Amino acid sequence: MALKAEDSFDIYSQLIQSFCRYAENTTVSESQSPAFNAQKEFQTCQDHACCTHSEAHTHILMQQWQLLEEQWEYIDHLKTDVAALKQLLHGFMNSLSGTDSGMEGTNHFLPPHQNPTLLKDEEIVASALNRPSVDINGFEENITTGAQIHAAFTKSPKKMPATSTPRKSEVLWSCSPTLATDGYFMLPDIILNPLDGKKLVSMLRSSNYEPHRFAELLFQHHVPHSLFQLWANKVNFDGSRGKLGLPRNLMIDILHQTSKRFVLGPKEKRKIKTRLNLLLRTRQDRAWWDVGL
């Protein structure tokens, strides 16, 4: 039996509507199924994990940048410290080289107008004795031993006729002392004992930081007791009063070492001279000599 066209169209429309309802119901059922929900949750977790990983990476980068800024700031501080150290080192080197700027900033013991290390030997001696400076470069330096110094004090008369008696003016020294330009006789130079830092500190403490006492300890350090016994009552500081003067190198060293550690004015120089002259007037026991050192 043949169907009409209108009836066929209605049948097709119903079929299409039924198919659409079936598709909608199938979609709703799938969205409500456990598998679909699990897949959706998995996708959400993946999105959240990606977001968390990005935030963590950004946080790490920020920490690294902050650390770099702190390191640069520390380097700037180091540059400032190095510049300050260079300036201090420059000033210290100037003080060692004896420049005016260095001496004004670091040397508190010596006046700026007098630096003993820059004075000549003859100027040091002349300044200590309050005499005009003289040129002593023409005199021969005679370094002698203790035996030669001992021989210098062994008097022997000239060979005279048997009937004559030698006068005091005719008594000679077997080793002639040095004649200075001012007419005073000075003993020949002696070998000076080395002075190390430990000994120097001990002498400064024993002297109670008094220049004349320190000069006396230097004298005892350089002059053996046996040699001092020969000098006693025959030698004084500068060779005045008809006596022999101390060896030139001994005087120079005593004044130089003392001037390096104390300010020596006219008063201090007179005290040093008086102290050594008082020491040379009488003989001293060996025990006292050793205790002094």
Swiss-Prot record:
Annotated GO biological process: pole plasm assembly
Keyword check for Transmembrane helix: no
Instruction: Give the BEN domain ranges.
Output: 187-287
Keywords of this protein's UniProt record, alphabetized? Cytoplasm, Developmental protein, Differentiation, Nucleus, Oogenesis
- What InterPro entries is this protein classified in? BEN_domain
Q: In which tissues is it expressed?
A: An mRNA and protein component of germ plasm and primordial germ cells (PGCs) throughout oogenesis and early development, being first localized to the granulo-fibrillar material (GFM) of the mitochondrial cloud in stage I and II oocytes and to the periphery of mature germinal granules both in oocytes and in embryos. Shows some somatic expression including the ectodermal cells of tailbud embryos. In adults, only expressed in ovaries.
Where is this protein found? Cytoplasm; Nucleus
Q: Does the keyword Nucleotide-binding apply?
A: no
The UniProt GO MF terms for this protein read:
DNA binding
Gene Ontology annotations for the cellular component aspect, listed alphabetically? cytoplasm; mitochondrial cloud; nucleus; P granule; pole plasm
Q: What quaternary arrangement does the UniProt entry report?
A: Interacts with poc1b.
**Per its database record, what is this protein's job?**
Probably plays a role in germ plasm formation, positioning and maintenance.
Record protein name field: Protein Pat
List the lineage, top down.
Answer: Eukaryota, Metazoa, Chordata, Craniata, Vertebrata
What gene codes for this chain? Answer: pat
